[in-house]
Amino acid sequence: MKLIILGSGTSQGVPVIGCRCAVCTSKDPRDNRLRTSAMLEWDDIRLVIDAGPDFRYQMLRTGVRHIDAILLTHEHKDHIGGLDDVRAFNFVDYPTIHRIDVFGTRQTLKCVRKDRSEERRV
């Protein structure tokens, strides 16, 4: 089993827009961090933990072509804000459509469903 850290930044990522602290103004590339997320790999299975706004870039950067499931730790936007980008994985091998299971607490999944239904009404 392998754990890949996809992001370890704050809810806004690092650097934070407009911040002038030493970390946010640092030239050290280690101080540039995407929002928190990780991926577990074992055998041929990939489980992503949280899909925040940086999800698309995190997947492109790691060269991932498929995921099997997503675990959402809670309903804050920095953990669910990239779910729309998950759709691309459903159609990687079109016309075969891949199902991706999403796990979370009842409250988290309720919030995701509500968020998705509100987007469709706009």
Place the predicted regions along the sequence by residue.
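Cofactor-binding loop segments of dinucleotide-utilizing enzymes, especially the Rossmann-like FAD-
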Residues: S8, T105-Q107
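A short, active-site helix/loop in glycosyltransferases that binds the activated sugar's phosphate group
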Residues: Q107-R116
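Conserved small/polar residues in nucleotide/adenosyl-binding loops
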Residues: E119-V122
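Detector for Asparagine
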Residues: D31-N32, N90, D115
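Active-site metal-binding motif and surrounding structural segment of the metallo-beta-lactamase
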Residues: R46-L47, A51-G104
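Short amphipathic alpha-helical surface micro-motifs
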Residues: R20-A22, D54, L83-D85, D115-S117
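Conserved beta-strand hairpin/beta-sheet module of binuclear metal-dependent hydrolase folds
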Residues: M1-T62
